[in-house]
Amino acid sequence: MKKHWPENERIKRRYFTFLKEAKRHGEPTVDAAAKALNRFEIYTRYRDFKTFHFQQAIAFKRYLAEQKDQQSGEKLSKAALHATLTQLKRFFQWVAWQPGYKSRLQYSDAEYFNLSDKDAWVATAQREQKAPTLVRKQGA
């Protein structure tokens, strides 16, 4: 049975309001943040965010890299890893400045949610789009 830490629920609600109202993000962004936080909470067994330690971020990255996509059954793509970890990094950077968390969390600990440079490059690479052409291929 999953347990929710009430203080975590309150700070998440404040963060989602911050994303919507202050940062002017839409529902898809807020939903992505909620999904990333849910994955992290499942991994930590719903521990209080005030007990966050950078070792949790390192271990979570390894755990997430081994997870399978529900639809394809394959490991999560680098883009999915990047999106999840970026949402978590932004949340922990924000929460480190909130009252009640400033003395417990280090702003710099959120940096441990970064992928390696190579993986981040793969995750954010722009794929060349094939555009239609008016030139006919020979022999077609």
Task: Give the location of each predicted region.
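Flexible glycine-/small-residue-enriched beta->alpha junction loops
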Residues: 129
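N-terminal core-binding DNA-recognition domain of tyrosine recombinases/integrases
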Residues: 13-28, 34-126
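Alpha-helix N-cap/N′ positions at the starts of helices
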Residues: 10-14, 139
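A detector for short, charged/polar N-terminal pre-domain segments
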Residues: 1-10
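Basic, Lys/Arg- and aromatic-enriched nucleic-acid-binding interface segment
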Residues: 133-140
